[in-house]
Amino acid sequence: MTSIGQRLVTVRPLPPGAAWVAVRVWFSILVPLLVLVAIDHVEWTLYAVFGAFTSLYGRERVDLHRIVRQGAAGLSLITATILGALVATSSAREWLAIPVAGAVAVVASYVSESHGWIPPGSLFQVFAFAAVASVPAEASDLVPAIVVVTLSALFAVLVGNVGAVVRRARRTADPAPPGHPIGGAHSGGWLYAAQSGIGVIAAGLIATGSGIGRPYWAMVSAVVPLMTHDFAAQLVRGLHRVIGTFIGLGVAWLLLDLDLADAVVVVIAATLQAFTELVIGRNYAFALICITPLALLIVHLAAPVIPINELLGDRGLETVIGVTIGLLVGYATRPRNATRA
C-alpha cells in the first residue's frame, strides 16, 4: 500500500486534453467577468463565476453527451447561486445558510455520485450557495443574480461545445468515460450524500458559533475530504487542501497588496483557474495554490470592504476547521471492514 507521505508528494502525469480544458475554462470565466467590469457591476462577479464553473464539467465527453452533462451541472450551479441570493436577503442569513447548505450538499452529492460527474461531489454547488449567501443582499439583487448566473452558465456550455460540429464532421467517436479521478466509481450514493450534509452542517455550526467572519469556507472545506470514499484518500486530500491553501494565502497576499485594477484582477483570476485545470489532476495541493488566491481575489472584487489581513486569516482558520470536521465525519462513517491507512 502506498504510504500517506508518498501520496502527498506524488505528481501524476498531465491528463490527456487538459490544456484544451484549461483554455475553455479560462475563456468561460474571463469574458463574463470582463463584461461586468465594462458595465461597472463588479458586485455581480460571484454570480458570473459560479455560472462559469459549468465549464469544469463534461470534460470527458463530447458532442451531445457533453452538452447534457454541462447542462445538468450548470442547472445545479444556477440553482445553488439563486438559493444563495435568496438567503442573502434574510437578516438571519448566517444561521439560515447552514441547513440550506447542508441540503445543497446532500442533493448535489447524490446526483454527482449517481451520474458519475467529473469533478465529483458537491464542492462547487456548496461553494456557490454559501459564498453568495454570505454577502448581504436586497430583494432587488435577485434579478441580476438570476440573469448573470444563467447567462454565464449558458456561455460556458457554448464555449465547451464549439468543437462539437468539427468532431461530428470527422466522425470522432465518444471516448470511453475515464475512471473516477479520486477514488473510483462507487455505489451507495445516499451514504456519501449524508456524509457531505453532516460535514457541511457541523462545520457551519462550529464556524458560525465561534464568530469567524466567513463560515462558508469551513463548510466548503468540510466537503473536500468527502469527495472520495477511502479514508486514506480522504486524509491525503484533506492535507493537500490545508497545505495548498496556506501556500496559496501567500500568493493571495502578494496579489491583493498590489491593489490591481478590476480588469487586471479578472484576467489573473481566469488565468489562475486555467492553471488549476492543468495541475489539479497531478497533485491537489498544487491546485489549491491557484484556487486560494483566485477565490480571495473574486471575493475581494465583489466585497472590497473586507480588510485583507482579516480575509486571509479567516480563510486559513476556516480551512483547518472544515477539513478537520470532514475527516472526522469520514472516519466515523467509514466501512467497518475498512483497512487501516
Region locations from a protein language model:
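Alpha-helical transmembrane segments and their membrane-interface boundaries
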Residues: M1-P293, I298-A341
